[in-house]
């Protein structure tokens, strides 16, 4: 990992993005993914194709505040200069917040110990237009206490198959650990904050969708325990919350802040 011209050097970057206009993180042939846009910017800087590896595969319309990625460059670009250089080539909806050199054994996805997602919901008669891309709208009143109670039942190690959509991939296991799940309210704004060791396809949006059913009085908080215990394939009973309210907030590479807590 010398850093001379032609020698590969590994970098780690933290990226924030507005996912509204994109088909998600992953490269797709018939749509524009954020990965493709970042790779194009780096290819211009490095003078050669660059493959970027992300910490997650966020869905279409999902946003990120602390997405992490790694890649190699052949040109010896100082890490301190990489933020400005990349942002000069990226659209306003995608910003590199931090850049650093990475050890060769670092992997943005495989080295992660956990992730925090936040889901934003606005409950009122009218959703202000400037909030529309980032807040899901709900006009019905919600029972905060019931949602908090239901959220606490997600905490722990469970089989979350009932809260996962059918992905086009085979998984070794659908068991995951949720370390904490908070529901906070500030005026009309509700924020759902969940930390876990990893999440299944659309799991976070499915859990939030079910909490909203609880908040509206359509489900009991204890139904979360029943669904987790049954560990049966997902049914129409579990709805998926819209993508626009979801943010990948932070990726953890140590166990600090990842102990199980119920609030």
PLM features: residue spans?
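Structured-RNA-binding interfaces characteristic of tRNA pseudouridine synthases
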Residues: 2-263
């Amino acid at each position: 990992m010398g850093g001379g011209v032609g020698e590969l050097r590994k970098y780690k970057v933290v990226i924030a993005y507005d996912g509204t206009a994109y088909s998600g993180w992953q490269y797709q042939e018939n749509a524009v993914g954020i990965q493709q846009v970042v790779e194009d910017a780096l290819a211009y800087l490095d003078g050669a194709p660059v493959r970027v590896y992300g910490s997650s595969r966020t869905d279409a319309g999902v946003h990120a505040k602390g997405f992490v990625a790694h890649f190699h460059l052949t040109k010896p670009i100082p890490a301190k200069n990489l933020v400005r250089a990349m942002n000069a080539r990226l659209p306003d909806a995608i910003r590199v917040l931090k850049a650093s050199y990475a050890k060769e054994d670092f992997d943005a996805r495989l080295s992660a110990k956990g992730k925090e997602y936040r889901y934003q919901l606005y409950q009122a008669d009218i959703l202000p237009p400037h909030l529309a891309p980032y807040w899901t709208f709900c006009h019905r009143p919600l029972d905060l206490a019931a949602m908090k109670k239901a959220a606490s039942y997600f905490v722990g190690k469970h089989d979350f198959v009932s809260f996962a959509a059918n992905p086009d991939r085979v998984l070794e296991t659908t068991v995951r650990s949720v370390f904490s799940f908070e529901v906070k309210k500030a005026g009309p704004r509700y924020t759902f904050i969940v930390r876990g060791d990893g999440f299944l396809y659309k799991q976070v949006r499915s859990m939030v969708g079910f909490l909203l059913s609880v908040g509206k009085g359509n489900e009991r908080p204890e139904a979360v325990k029943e669904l987790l215990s049954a560990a049966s394939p997902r049914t129409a009973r579990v709805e998926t919350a819209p993508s626009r309210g979801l943010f990948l907030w932070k990726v953890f590479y140590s166990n600090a802040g990842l102990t199980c807590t119920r609030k």
